[in-house]
Every structure is written in C-alpha cells, then in structure tokens.
UniProtKB/Swiss-Prot annotation:
This protein's UniProt keywords: Cell inner membrane, Cell membrane, Membrane, Transmembrane, Transmembrane helix
Stored HAMAP family: UPF0761
Compartment list: Cell inner membrane
Residues of the signal peptide: none
Organism, scientific name: Chromobacterium violaceum (strain ATCC 12472 / DSM 30191 / JCM 1249 / CCUG 213 / NBRC 12614 / NCIMB 9131 / NCTC 9757 / MK)
Transmembrane segments: 52-72, 79-99, 110-130, 150-170, 185-205, 214-234, 258-278
Family classification: Belongs to the UPF0761 family.
Name recorded for this polypeptide: UPF0761 membrane protein CV_0810
Entry keyword Cytoplasm: no
Protein topology in the membrane: Multi-pass membrane protein
Cellular component GO terms, alphabetical: plasma membrane
Length: 417
C-alpha cells in the first residue's frame, strides 16, 4: 500500500474511533453538567458536617441490628473492622478508629432515652440524604412522614442485615474452601472484590428505595457497582495523597487525624453523590435522551404523548408503569416523573397500585390550551403591565385554536384512534 494511502487509512480509522467514542464523551459531559447544576461539591460539604453528628449513631444502630441475631455474633468484630475500614480508612489515623470503637461500645450501654436520641440523630442524616437524592432525581414532593419512616427503617435495618448476611456467606466460603491457607493471593483478591460487592449492595439499596421516584433495579445495581469501584480507587488515591503529598502531620501535629478525616468524609460523599447522579442519568442513555434539551415546548409534547398513551391504555382497561411509558416517551425517568407530577396536580392522571399510572379525566375533556398553560406559558394576571398584555394579545389566536382541540381530537388526527 502506498504511504499516502496508508496515511489516509490511518486518519480515517482514527476518525472512526473518535466517532464511535463520541456518545460516551457526550454522555460524560452530560453527567458533568448535571453535577454542576445540582451543586454536588457544595452538598458534599454540607453532608460532611451532618455526618460528623450522625456517624456514631448510625454505626451503633448498625452494630445493634447485627448483634440482635445470634448467627452474626461471631462476625461482629469483623463487621466493625469492615465498616471502619470504609468509613475511617487506616491512613485517616488510628486515633479516630479507637474513639469510634469506644463510642460504639459505650453507646450499647445507653438507656432507652439515649437510644431514642441516637435514633433521632441518625434519622436526621437519613432525612438529609433523602432530600439530596430527591433533588438529584428531580423530585419536587417528598413522601408522607409515615412512608418516610418506613423507608428510613428499611435502610437502617436491612442495610446492616445485607452486609452481615453477605459477610457470613463470604466467610463460610473462605472456610469451606480453605482459600486463605491454600491460595493466599487469590484470597486477597477475592476479599477486595468482596468488599466492593458488599459496598455495592448497600449503595444499590440506597439508590433504589431512597428517592421518591421510580429507579429501575438494573440502573441501581450498575450505579452502585461503578460507585463502589470508584470508592476503592478514591481510597487508594487518598492514601497516596496523604502518605506522599500532604503534610498534615507537619502542620497539625497530633490533631492531623481531624482534617484528614474531614477530607475523607467529604471525598466519600462526593463519590456517593456522583454515583447517584450517574444512576439517575442512566435512563437518559437509552434512546440518546441525553442529547435533547428539556425545554418547555418539549415537556408540552411529552405531556401530550403521556396522555395519549394513558388514554389508549384506559380504553384497554390497563394502567401503565413508568417503565412502559419510558419505552415510548424518550426522556429520563426524572423528567418523565416531573411531567406526571404536574399532570397529577391538575387531576389529569393519578398513580395507582405498583407505581402504575391511570387517566383520571376523559381525553375529550382535556384541551390543549390548558396543557400549553401548564408546560409552556401562563399569563400572570397580577402583572398587568404592557408586556404581559401584548404577549396575551399575540398568543390569543394560538390559545383559541388550542382551546378547540382536545386530547381525543389530537389522537384522531395522529391516527391513535
């Protein structure tokens, strides 16, 4: 092959590779924009402060749940070590680890009133986490307090049980196969992988049930796996930074553990929240929904599409889940939830059993003008200025035309009826 042709072939091949990777780079930029809009860096700092108050109560509750089951009694010490290695890495200072263990041991001797106060502090952290996750998933309205309590109780009890059960199974496997004696290197690799899997289980539980929004199970699992791997990489990078680069010991002396611990908790929350943003954005990957802009006129079209789908399902006597709606409306689940919430506020739709949605009004009773005012433009009657009056005059003919068309008429025009 002539050199010129070889050079042209190389350029073409490189261009093809760049074109193939373009969706991944574009999706990464999309996630970065979402993190910036959600102020993940600032929220991580806020959660770091809240964690300082609630870390010991959460740690104590987790140990109390584990110790309540005799089958886990032999593994309580290992459970402590595993939790502390995640929450307080060894490079953050042995002083904090010793204090954490002392706090947890002393907390087990508390009276009923003291335990209640510990629970309240832990619930405060859970409430802050829920509000943060709801903001990431675009939830405007939280759960009722009774439903909130059920979610918090599930996380505070099921999380430690999942960790304890997984740890019990893991240690049984090691004991049955004698990996630690026969293949120590493989045992170390499997133990590191087991830590990632255990962390992913808890994160998947958080990502799946804490947001007041439908989160597909596979999205929660993928997001949790990616986040747990990032946590391990962050732990390694942070250890290198503290050991080789930073000079906290030189500046702070005996108090060096405190800023190191604060910085680690901040990094921990930063990775967890970044994983939550990644999990919420996974629904935008399907159908290249991340490429579109969620502008008012697009939400107007999405609302029409949702109503048409629910009208057709109503005629069949069915209800549609968010997953079924998402197959036709190419948006993220958070954006779809926002459209459904606005329609529900006006009484057009309602969520029924199992997150399924139904149409509450006849399609012939819903005109396009009302939907236009909900999602695109509504005149502010209290303004009374010249600009508002002029806009109302210009939009008058359009409003009249939309007023004459119902969702049922639209369905006939587009061949849905």
């Amino acid at each position: 092959m002539p050199p010129l042709l070889r050079g042209g072939f190389g350029i073409t091949f490189a261009a093809m590779q760049v074109q193939r990777l373009e969706p991944y780079f574009g999706f990464a930029r999309f996630i970065a924009r979402r993190m910036s809009c959600l102020r993940v860096l600032q929220i991580s700092g806020s959660l770091t402060f809240t964690t300082l108050l609630a870390l010991v109560p959460l740690f104590t509750i987790a140990l109390s749940v584990i110790s309540a089951f005799p089958v886990f009694s032999d593994y309580s010490t290992r459970f402590k070590i595993m939790l502390l290695s995640t929450l307080v890495p060894e490079f953050a200072g042995k002083v904090i680890t010793v204090y954490m263990r002392q706090f947890a041991d002393n907390a087990e001797k508390l009276t009923a009133a003291g335990i209640v106060m510990l629970g309240v502090t832990a619930l405060m952290l859970m409430s802050t986490i829920e509000r943060t996750f709801n903001a990431i998933w675009g939830v405007r309205r939280g759960r009722p307090w009774l439903q909130q309590s059920m979610v918090y109780w599930t996380v505070l009890t099921l999380g430690p049980l999942v960790l304890g059960g997984s740890l019990l199974s893991w240690r049984w496997l090691f004991k049955a196969t004698r990996l630690e004696k026969n293949l120590p290197l493989l045992a170390s690799v499997l133990e590191a992988g087991g830590t990632i899997v255990l962390t992913a289980l808890v994160l998947a539980l958080l990502y799946r049930i804490v947001p007041n929004r439908f989160v597909p199970f596979r999205h929660a699992v993928w997001g949790a796996l990616v986040t747990s791997v990032l946590l391990e990489l962050t732990k390694m990078g942070f250890g290198f930074y503290i050991g080789q680069v930073a000079s906290y010991q030189l500046v702070y002396g005996a108090f060096a553990s405190i800023p190191i611990f604060l910085l680690w908790v901040y990094c921990l929350w930063l990775v967890v929240l970044a994983g939550a943003v990644f999990t919420s954005a996974l629904s935008y990957w399907e159908g290249d929904a991340w490429r579109r802009r969620n502008e008012p006129h697009r939400r107007f079209q999405d609302a029409l599409e949702v109503l048409l789908l629910l009208d057709a399902a109503h005629a069949r006597g069915e209800a549609l889940t968010p997953r079924q709606l998402r197959q036709q409306v190419k948006v993220g689940y958070d954006e779809l939830g926002l459209v459904l919430d606005r329609l529900a506020q006006r009484g057009y739709v309602q969520k029924g059993h199992g997150d399924a949605w139904v149409l509450m009004r006849r399609a012939a009773a819903i005109n396009l003008s009302d939907l236009f005012q909900i999602f695109v433009y509504r005149r502010d009657a209290s303004a009374g200025d010249a600009l508002d009056a002029t806009l109302a005059e210009l939009l008058g003919p359009l409003t009249e035309q939309l007023q004459a068309v119902t969702v049922a008429d639209l369905a006939r025009r587009v061949g849905r009826k």
